[in-house]
Amino acid sequence: MAGHSKWANIQHRKNAQDAKRGKLFTKLIKEITVAARMGGSDLNSNPRLRLAVDKALDANMTKDTVERAIKRGAGELEGVNYEEIRYEGYGPGGVAIMVDTMTDNRNRTVAEVRHAFTKCGGNLGTDGSVAYLFEKQGVLSYPAGSDEDRIMEVALEAGAEDVAVGDDGSIEVITNPDDYEAVRAAMTEAGLKPEHNEVTMRAGTAAPVDVESAPSLLKLLDMLDDLDDVQNVYTNADFPDEVMQALEA
């Protein structure tokens, strides 16, 4: 599975923990607010907002909270104006890292991001230093044991770019971002609702991480992901099974 990283699986577990302490809601509200501000409050004409709202509802956010966030973004209610900033850099072992943030204070945010990189042996780079390594994709994930033939049939007919099967039997449907909503709707309508789905940035080529670099790299990714202003962390790091086993030993 090209570009598949165990960091993605780690993030999914972290998201569950974040949800328990309310941090996930904060991220989702920011995304809804900014999406509504940039593209308007109509879900039918604003795919970014529709995706953000779907994610919020999937996380059991109340419709009232969602509606207030949309109104704040559309200027119908007072609220904080967030600015989107992407930071790029290199982590231990030379792996590429992109950090998407939403902030009301860019000086605070860049200081916190730079501190995390420096503390963990990485380097904050310039705009464009690693972005070329990543591609925006829609991803729908299914657990091992799912009906591979049926998923492949429906996905490709709906316009998916690829269907990839992992070594563990898990399945990923890859789409162009513009086709993501249509593919997801077709899969759900066919009774094939994904276990996890998102529009994300995927590296074209993975960078294997050795056992020496792995602890400090994971610490850096965790530090970045835990920052209040950080929405998403992307990396081309690939943690081989033997490295993860060594870390868990």
Curated annotation (Swiss-Prot):
Statement: the UniProt record of this protein carries the keyword DNA-binding: yes
Molecular function GO labels: DNA binding
Keyword Transcription in record: yes
Cellular localisation: Cytoplasm
Major subcellular site: cytoplasm
Alphabetized InterPro entries for the sequence: Integrase-like_N (IPR017856), TACO1_YebC-like_2nd/3rd_dom (IPR048300), TACO1_YebC_N (IPR049083), Transcrip_reg_TACO1-like (IPR002876), Transcrip_reg_TACO1-like_dom3 (IPR026564), YebC-like (IPR029072)
GO BP term, example: regulation of DNA-templated transcription
Pfam families xref list: TACO1_YebC_N (PF20772), Transcrip_reg (PF01709)
GO cellular component, one term: cytosol
Swiss-Prot/TrEMBL keywords: Cytoplasm, DNA-binding, Transcription, Transcription regulation
Family membership: Belongs to the TACO1 family.
Name of the protein described by the UniProt record: Probable transcriptional regulatory protein Tgr7_2237
